[in-house]
């Protein structure tokens, strides 16, 4: 009887908390198995899995949640999934920090960003939601399925609105018939132009040619 009463009280508390969040000026609505509220309601911790939904419809799924209402910063760990439905983007990782005031997401561990035609993987990712910019660091890989191109580098920056990719460190671009390697690459996805800088090497497997130069510009459409 005591256990039933305890469960009822816990469920009632969670329901009351969700209703309060939904009807007030909260940054997130939490739907979590266990919730802990500390520091006069300014620190919200969640355990055993759940979701946090922001006003714009973005949903974060994770095992653990730590939200500071004063700073509007949400930290999540374990099986993290961030869904930005407005930009059609899904980000997964081991851990993530969401700076709500700046609309920026930082991930660490097994990080991956996916949309309709592109995938970016790396050890860590930065996502600037307002400017639609991705930065992938350490073992970064960017795949463009539409143009059948894969880019590898130490760091990759993807300007989604401009459809441009910039890389630094051990950079390599690969498609069906060509490979370009250099210290850094620039890829204009709209015009299909590659620029390789410093120790650039371009291989054309179809024509069986290799070009070496300090800088190489490859106009793929031509």
Predicted regions and their residues:
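Bacterial N-terminal signal peptides that target proteins for export
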Residues: 1-9
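Bacterial N-terminal signal peptides
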Residues: 8-17
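N-terminal amphipathic/hydrophobic interface segments
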Residues: 21-222
């Amino acid at each position: 009887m005591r256990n039933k009463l305890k469960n009822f009280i816990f469920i009632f508390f969670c329901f009351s908390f969700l209703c309060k969040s939904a009807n007030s000026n909260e940054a997130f609505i939490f739907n979590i198995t266990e919730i802990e509220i500390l520091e006069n309601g300014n620190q919200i911790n969640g355990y055993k899995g759940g979701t946090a939904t922001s006003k714009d419809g973005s949903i974060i799924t994770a095992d653990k949640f730590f939200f500071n209402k004063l700073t509007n910063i949400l930290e999540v760990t374990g099986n993290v999934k961030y869904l930005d439905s407005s930009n059609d983007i899904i980000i997964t990782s081991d851990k993530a920090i969401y700076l709500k005031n700046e609309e920026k997401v930082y991930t660490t561990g097994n990080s991956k960003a996916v949309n309709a035609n592109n995938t970016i993987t790396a050890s860590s990712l930065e996502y600037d939601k307002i400017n639609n910019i991705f930065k992938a660091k350490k073992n970064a890989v960017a795949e463009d399925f539409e143009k059948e191109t894969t880019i590898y580098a130490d760091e990759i920056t993807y300007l989604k609105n401009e459809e441009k990719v910039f890389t630094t460190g051990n950079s390599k671009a690969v498609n069906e018939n060509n490979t370009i390697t250099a210290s850094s690459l620039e890829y204009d996805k709209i015009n299909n132009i590659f620029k390789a800088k410093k120790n650039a090497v371009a291989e054309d497997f179809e024509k069986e040619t290799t070009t070496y130069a300090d800088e190489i510009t490859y106009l793929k459409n031509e």
